């Protein structure tokens, strides 16, 4: 049982690789109460929004898309991005506690689910491992977008699961009429969690200024039983206590705490038909890893953004926009020493620079869209603090150059969209790295990756159509081909990974991964009763996964040896949602269900697949009060890979 209480004062209106997964039946109940105070009332409580990844409004996006904003976002706001969107259709979350919950979309995670902040890469290392947190604070986000299909191709070619874009208002595009602000506070009973966030916006002449901050502190969360479940490696360790073979903690889960804070500042010069803005963000996040090995991660990031947009720059075009971001990310991984407590073990650094040019054209023969270019340069480094040697994978520089083009059209009751993206990706490892000896049992040791540069040419495209066969009723069909290059970790890993209890081995011979996704949906978008049903079939060529060889690494506390491999695979699934008066004044309800099944074409189940689930949400909004409750039931996952433990 989990209860969340929110208090808000709105002063003005605001527009793995190699993870062994143990699955079980899960039931979650959430209750929240909110009081909302507005400086001025509005006859329409629902803000009109538009996805930045689409030219059309929310109800007309062809592929299943969700945009969280306003009160709905505030009520679902969690400690992490995964916790915030974890009950949306087709979206679950990784299981590394309060601090490192990353979205899992339709059975896919890691590099197959791209995370953006204001349309540019977050610049963290969360795609490498599920214990690495997403470095994009959500407390002061204006909206969170979940995109698929052609809209997703605008930002990346490898998002076969989907794309999540966290949008904030640090770079304002219009001058505030007056100084405005907002404060949000919450309390969680399950972790004695206390959170607060605030934002202030004002203008001086033609300059708009934005300041936001947030703090979130959560203790180890309460559990209804014991910390040990069936499965291997059952030792739980916490600082200050000696290692034991099977310490069975009750009442609270060790190393499940989370403490984070962030500060963001932005300024914009607003002209008659353009704006130019900059912003800076500092983020700190210290969180425990609730695995049997224990440990914690101290994470920080400095991020700098620049945007310039000119409206109606020349005939036939509605806007030209240039965006850039620099992120300097690092985190320190701490292992548990029985004598000294948390001891620094590894330091991860990632420096990322990204540039985008986006040119949007006006409607032509029913079509409206944009095209542009994107350039990304990143440098990843992981080092063992005690020895100065590499940790898990050698230092690697990744270069990506892309061209994209998306179009959306409307002709009466028919709509269509098209997307095309070409990406050239290169992975360049440190070629003088000396790999460690895992001491595999039984011998021989797994082959070490070749430290050679790899280049990949990727072509992704999408087409979809929607027929509005009656007022408020529509049915759509879309087809997306998405190609992604293997990540640096999948190519070059060769080392110990404490949190997943594995010795990870990359495969430098991996080819590009290609997904072919066919999707059908039917939806009702008007009236008090609304709903949607989505069904999809996603077939993969060269699906990359971590295979457990059955060996153990003597140099890594007898952790399991996991090697990157490729195979043909298929993921199929369905999602359904039915709502009554949802996000409106009065009483409302939302009923949802989703399920996916992943298999190797040669036989056997894909690893790391989420369990089927059903959920119910109830809400009542009256005057300035809002109360809601949600209940989610996850079934037992019995379709496991041969090496997974249930």
Segments from the language model and where they lie:
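Short, acidic, small-residue-rich periplasmic hinge/interaction motif at the N-terminus
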Residues: 39-74, 82, 110
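Extracytoplasmic beta-strand/coil segments of soluble accessory domains associated
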Residues: 82-124
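Short acidic/polar hinge/loop motifs at secondary-structure boundaries
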Residues: 121-150
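Outer-membrane beta-barrel translocator/receptor signature
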Residues: 139-143, 153-236, 258-261
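Transmembrane beta-barrel wall of Gram-negative outer-membrane proteins
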Residues: 191-217, 229-286, 300-312, 363-367, ...
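Flexible loop and strand-edge segments within Gram-negative outer membrane beta-barrel domains
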Residues: 256-260, 273-320, 326-352, 384, ...
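Outer-membrane beta-barrel signature, preferentially recognizing the C-terminal barrel domain
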Residues: 294-313, 348, 396-398, 446-468, ...
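Gram-negative outer-membrane beta-barrel transporters
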Residues: 369, 413-414, 425, 528-540, ...
